[in-house]
Amino acid sequence: MRVVGLISGGKDSCFNMLQCVSAGHSIVALANLRPADHAASDELDSYMYQTVGHQAVDLIAEAMGLPLYRRTIEGSSVHIDREYSPTDGDEVEDLYQLLKHVKEEMHVDGVSVGAILSDYQRVRVENVCARLQLQPLAYLWRRDQAALLSEMISSGLHAILIKVAAFGLHPDKHLGKSLAEMELYLHELSEKYGVHICGEGGEYETFTLDCPLFKKKIIIDATETVIHSDDAFAPVGFLRFTKMHTEDKTEVRTL
């Protein structure tokens, strides 16, 4: 199938695209929903979308050599019942309009979706895909999270933490750390406090700097740390990318 990769920049959306290719599908375009330029924060109060790291999403398209379709999130979480039906002003309708445009231009048959555990997201993506006669491809759905994280790391996917929001995770200590660096500690947090190893409870979010599908790798040159909530036990903070570029993988970087 001709597939559009629905991406946030995080590990799940990128790894699911890798699974699509392994299954014989072709990723022909990427799609992303982003906050408005005038948004008060990179971190939108969205039930559906990761928006932290949106400044660098275009570099994923550059790294993969694919067209990127983007749309501003204009709606909000209006229809929050378990089942979803089309609702004016809901952020799900932004996804509908985005994928409708991609289907018209790129003649795609399927959508790569990095959902692992959220029924809320799954139901809404399936609703949009059904309305557009697109096939959702969610190879990570309900996978064991410990095994999945290990598989991501061993596949050559390199992602860093760009948001933390859980007891045991601290902006000063853990933002910018790679999944490989964090794997054992995430296991500890899971055993002690029930933290979801893949961050499916909102404990952390990531941004992918390299993976086997990338023809180039992404280099983050400069960031700033934003503290969203200075809670004494579980502070919420994220990285804002201020300077970044892509680089050929064959290049040897010198310090």
From Swiss-Prot:
UniProt keyword terms in alphabetical order: ATP-binding, Ligase, Nucleotide-binding
Catalytic activity line of the entry: diphthine-[translation elongation factor 2] + NH4(+) + ATP = diphthamide-[translation elongation factor 2] + AMP + diphosphate + H(+)
Record-linked InterPro entries: Diphthami_syn_dom, DPH6/MJ0570, Rossmann-like_a/b/a_fold
UniProt pathway annotation: Protein modification; peptidyl-diphthamide biosynthesis
GO biological process: protein histidyl modification to diphthamide
GO molecular function, one term: diphthine-ammonia ligase activity
E.C. number: 6.3.1.14
SUPFAM superfamilies: Adenine nucleotide alpha hydrolases-like (SSF52402)
Organism domain of life: Eukaryota
CDD domains in the cross-refs: AANH_PF0828-like (cd01994)
Function noted in UniProt: Amidase that catalyzes the last step of diphthamide biosynthesis using ammonium and ATP. Diphthamide biosynthesis consists in the conversion of an L-histidine residue in the translation elongation factor eEF-2 (EEF2) to diphthamide.
Family named by the database record: Belongs to the Diphthine--ammonia ligase family.
Protein name: Diphthine--ammonia ligase
UniProt lineage: Eukaryota, Metazoa, Chordata, Craniata, Vertebrata
Gene that specifies this protein: dph6
